[in-house]
Amino acid sequence: MQPSLIPSLLETAAARNGDGRVILYSQGNREDPRSITYRDLLETASKASVAVHNHQNYTPGAAVLLHFNNHLDNIVWFWAVLLAGCIPAITPAFSNNPVQRVANLEHLSSTLITDWCLTSQALLAEFAGQDAIEPVSVETLGWEKASPASNTASVKAKPTDTALLLFTSGSTGKSKAVCLSHFQIVSAIAGKLSVVPLPEQSSFLNWVGLDHVAAIIEIHLQALYADLDQVHVPGSDVISDPIWFLDLMATHRVSRTFAPNFFLARIRDALVQNARSASPRQWDLSGLRYVASGGEANTTKTCDDLSQLLKSFGAPLNVIVPGFGMTETCAGAIFNTNCPDYDKKHGLEYTSVGSCMPGIFMRVTNQQGDPLPPGEMGSLELAGPVVFRQYLNNPAATQESFTMDGWFKTGDCGTLDENGYLVLGGRAKETIIINGVKYSPHEIETAVEEHNIKGLSRSFTCCFSSLSPGAETEEIVLVYLPTYAPEDIPARAATADAISKVVLMSTGSRPHIIPLEQALLPKSTLGKLSRSKIKAAYERGEYRTHDSINRSLIARHRQATRASPKNDFEKGLLEIFLRSFKISEDEFDVQTPIFDVGIDSIELINLKRDIEQHLGFADATIPIIILLENTTVRELAAALDNLYRPKEYNPVVTLQAHGDKNPLWLVHPGAGEVLIFINLAKFITDRPVYALRARGFDEGEKPFDSIEDAVTSYYNGVKSKQPHGPYALAGYCYGSMLAFEVAKKLEENGDEVRFVGSFNLPPHIKMRMRELDWKECLLHLAYFLDLITQKRSRELAVELDGLDQDTILQAIIDEADKERYAQLSLSRPFLSRWADVAYELHRIAGDYDPDGRVASMDVFFSIPLAIAAASKSEWRNVHLSQWDDFTRSHVRFHDVPGEHYSMIGPEHVFAFQKILRSALAERGM
């Protein structure tokens, strides 16, 4: 019996074959995948659903955003939200462009009418710069220890209800939320499985994010329905190494997977190279039945070449199945199961996408909406139970997408041949498809112009796509009107570099850039450029001379300004670049931007790994954004040097370097470290954020021996980065006292301090400081770092009383959570030094009495430690209110959520940063 609700797919799979598995490879891990049975997945998701149901933002039947960067989290929380009776809405990866990212989050909030998103602690920073959506870190929900829900809220759903929200391609534009019902999804899965039967004891293979309709429906849900295993791998690992893709298919006896045309070409090239090697690899692909291919045009020659190669390893000749589908049709719904023979027989340069599966119908119409006979080009329209019914909260887009008689207008053009096979012939709407991903040309143009690139005239930028003869995927072409003189070659090169950087960060693809004179960029009477006319002129070759001259001038400029490596580090990096790009030193030097060699996102990933191997990193530790922002060997060498070079003691730690407002300075708590501020700083994007870190952590450093010593060091550190005010300083707990003292010193020297913040510390602290000996400091540190629980720290305080430091240290290491200890990369010597730093900080404050006044004070108060006050009101009114004695104006109090140790932790940092930013604004900062 066919299930009617999506949760039934998992429940049935868990009951029918509890050993069916989800197999997951993490980034860079090719040897030791994680495996979770369908039975265990149901239990895990059921536990997580309790946390969703109990969250303060929970509303039955509402949409819940999911934003994760790995398959396991997406899968678990997809089911958790469904089982809690809500609608999962899986977000695509956010843009690297901060402006686009914030705009997208605000758009998601207004579209879904939601103000929260489940995510991971590692991704909290991606929600910076906006207040529309609060990120909720799943690590803070404590769901692992919950009991599985006895029954699920989802059983109340009806087959026609929305089960899942997926977003149309909107990497650079405003995406639409597609409502996919239980009935629609189940109908689509049944239709897909009927097209090509799959063998038992085989598996599905997915390598794209679960936000993509092909991953969540065509692989994850269909595998459950078919009672087969499913394998999920990171896309970057597969795309950069097609041979591993073949290894995976052989290892896991994959019967169904997918690959767009560009990746089919990479697999073909890898197999050709393998055949030429001295010891060619062999694979058993006899279980492979179905390599679905779509998202961009498939060349018949590529499909034919690869089909022949795969056939030699046991796959059927028609294993590559070009098709057509959209998010609105639950991915592929029209399939060509006779490729490449059918396409060769009919002399097609680009393959047909075939005929409809059960559950969908197609027609091709003219401009009046009348169906056209075979062979005539028109608009492709679809209908049937597999086709969606509406975009969420967007009636205008929904109405525009359907004909009066209820057919969905795909926006694509095509013809039906005499056999009812569909041959696509372009898109009615302006869309760019790069490596199977859609982008809006208008939004790319906007991103370029919003960067105010010197050398580019605003409103004369035009972006479009073009598929060159013999190419496997489209390229982005961008033409613009320059402001520089034609003979200003440095400006010409700098403008091209700036444009390339913006487009690469937005799309992962390097654009083909051509500066044109204004006569070639005519505007309409409404002041608009005609993208279609400009594209047609480009494809007719009318810009070929301008393009050739531009390339030649920039190449000569690079040659004339060629630079040699300054040191061995630059030399080593240059060799990696040359080897990765397979170019000579005549073509590339330490100051050549990587965009100049035509690098794309896949080659960038390969370059990143080559550099990591050269530097001896065991794991992928260089953030990709480092390569995107530092595009020459020289820039990258400097950036890596700053990241990893040991430094002499400097109290200043740069947590966030960007923004045009005056910096915010944050002073460490009693532990001396500034790690606690990292998540907070990520949300403050309009100003630099610096932290002041205590002395004594590095070998050979001595901790501060007095408050004056620390204040002088911090004062000098502040002045070295920010010579002039107005200043904004704040401290967490113990750091509040130091922030107050540094503020006084600044004012004494004639500077304006406009903001002083105390994060939950009263002015009088010496009695508490005297209570904390070395053992207590270490126990507080262990609890603060989540190595032990607060309860256990109090028990150990008694058990370890009177013992020597070495014994105490070893006892706490033995008690520590081993996974957390390893996660923090702790060692016995470092933990001992850390305890020394914390103890010395408390010791030097044992006689501290506050005196003097600062202009103002903002106190951010949370639930206090039990030892400090009996209630929050007592804490504020009796203890914290004493700051009034040390300010020249009344203290402003800010009630913040959480407890003393969690107020700026992952669970509460989003709310805290909103209150902090508001307080800064109220002080004129």
UniProtKB/Swiss-Prot annotation:
<dbReference type="GO" id="GO:0005737">
    <property type="term" value="C:cytoplasm"/>
</dbReference>
<dbReference type="InterPro" id="IPR020845">
    <property type="entry name" value="AMP-binding_CS"/>
</dbReference>
<dbReference type="GO" id="GO:0016740">
    <property type="term" value="F:transferase activity"/>
</dbReference>
<dbReference type="InterPro" id="IPR020806">
    <property type="entry name" value="PKS_PP-bd"/>
</dbReference>
<keyword id="KW-0596">Phosphopantetheine</keyword>
<feature type="domain" description="Carrier">
    <location>
        <begin position="564"/>
        <end position="644"/>
    </location>
</feature>
<dbReference type="GO" id="GO:0031177">
    <property type="term" value="F:phosphopantetheine binding"/>
</dbReference>
<dbReference type="Pfam" id="PF00975">
    <property type="entry name" value="Thioesterase"/>
</dbReference>
<dbReference type="InterPro" id="IPR036736">
    <property type="entry name" value="ACP-like_sf"/>
</dbReference>
<dbReference type="Pfam" id="PF00550">
    <property type="entry name" value="PP-binding"/>
</dbReference>
<protein>
    <recommendedName>
        <fullName>Aspulvinone E synthetase melA</fullName>
        <ecNumber>2.3.1.-</ecNumber>
    </recommendedName>
</protein>
<feature type="region of interest" description="Adenylation (A) domain">
    <location>
        <begin position="11"/>
        <end position="434"/>
    </location>
</feature>
<dbReference type="InterPro" id="IPR001031">
    <property type="entry name" value="Thioesterase"/>
</dbReference>
<feature type="region of interest" description="Thioesterase (TE) domain">
    <location>
        <begin position="663"/>
        <end position="923"/>
    </location>
</feature>
<dbReference type="InterPro" id="IPR042099">
    <property type="entry name" value="ANL_N_sf"/>
</dbReference>
<dbReference type="InterPro" id="IPR009081">
    <property type="entry name" value="PP-bd_ACP"/>
</dbReference>
<dbReference type="InterPro" id="IPR000873">
    <property type="entry name" value="AMP-dep_synth/lig_dom"/>
</dbReference>
<dbReference type="Pfam" id="PF00501">
    <property type="entry name" value="AMP-binding"/>
</dbReference>
<feature type="modified residue" description="O-(pantetheine 4'-phosphoryl)serine">
    <location>
        <position position="601"/>
    </location>
</feature>
<keyword id="KW-0597">Phosphoprotein</keyword>
<keyword id="KW-0963">Cytoplasm</keyword>
<dbReference type="InterPro" id="IPR045851">
    <property type="entry name" value="AMP-bd_C_sf"/>
</dbReference>
<dbReference type="GO" id="GO:0031957">
    <property type="term" value="F:very long-chain fatty acid-CoA ligase activity"/>
</dbReference>
<dbReference type="InterPro" id="IPR029058">
    <property type="entry name" value="AB_hydrolase_fold"/>
</dbReference>
<dbReference type="GO" id="GO:0006633">
    <property type="term" value="P:fatty acid biosynthetic process"/>
</dbReference>
<comment type="function">
    <text>Nonribosomal peptide synthase; part of the gene cluster that mediates the biosynthesis of Asp-melanin, a pigment that confers resistance against UV light and hampers phagocytosis by soil amoeba. The nonribosomal peptide synthase melA converts 4-hydroxyphenylpyruvate (4-HPPA) to aspulvinone E. The tyrosinase tyrP then performs hydroxylations of both aromatic moieties of aspulvinone E. The product of tyrP is highly unstable, and, due to the high reactivity of methides and ortho-diquinones, the polymeric Asp-melanin forms spontaneously.</text>
</comment>
<keyword id="KW-0808">Transferase</keyword>
<comment type="similarity">
    <text>Belongs to the ATP-dependent AMP-binding enzyme family.</text>
</comment>
